[in-house]
Amino acid sequence: MPGPPVAVPVVLAVAAVLVSGCGGGGGTAGNGSVSPAAGGALPQATTYTTLKDLPADPSPSAALDGTVVHPAETAPVSAQPGAPAVAELPAAQLKGDTWVPVVESRPGWKRVLLPSRPNGVTGWIPDSGLKTARSGQAIKVDVGDRKLTLLNAGRPAGTWPVAVGAPKTPTPVGRTFLLASLAPAKPTFSPLILPVGAHSATLDTFGGGPGTVAFHGWPSTSVFGKAVTHGCVRVPADALKRLAKVPLGTPVVITA
């Protein structure tokens, strides 16, 4: 089974405000609200939405086998195999292809992690029309030790000290995945921002964005090894270069 393609960074003016904890600005406290779908359409499973009536990740701390899927076109999302769709997973997100990790399989169906609120939300999508690949890599973040480890075939390929969320704006724990690769349109604190499919649990919004958690660089090395962010994970320049080569959909496991 081939691996998913490495994402080419997309230049977006919104990159700097999409994610939480990425510099100056403020957030709005709370637990998020459901984004209404226009005209009664099903809500889209994106980083901007909150989805109702879908199951939570059954094993939020377990390792995944690296199987990831990409819908060739918008896929219906159900709470159970064969149940009516309650959301839709678009084929593209943030100007790039949607790749999501598989957490469970049944005949004709794949249960996948979704990039929406609440954190750890999952849904079942039909396996017809899916491109399937396998990522041999995984990313682990230990919030307590404030370290990030890149795994290749289950073995550490690099470990770095990182900055994580402050006590009042912690980095959320659980399983998620690499969602996108964004290059800010204007010079900012990081040449690359790598959003994941998780959000701040304490901020509804941050800097005009939906409070998406991301990996990104930082101009000062003094922050590494500290709990000082609004939820994002600030990484050293060498780590960011390595993470930039990781395919979209690659599992990310964040532990306390």
Language-model segments: which ranges?
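Bacterial N-terminal signal peptides that target proteins for export
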Residues: 1-10
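C-terminal motif of bacterial Sec signal peptides marking the signal peptidase cleavage site
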Residues: 18-21
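Bacterial signal peptide processing site
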Residues: 23-26
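Boundary regions of SH3-family modules and the immediately adjacent low-complexity/disordered segments
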Residues: 32-62, 114-141
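Beta-loop motif signature
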Residues: 39-101
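A mature extracytoplasmic/lumenal domain signature
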Residues: 81, 106, 114-118, 129, ...
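SH3/SH3-like beta-barrel superfamily modules
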Residues: 88-128
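Exported/periplasmic cell-wall-interacting domains
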Residues: 116, 129-138, 170-175, 185-256
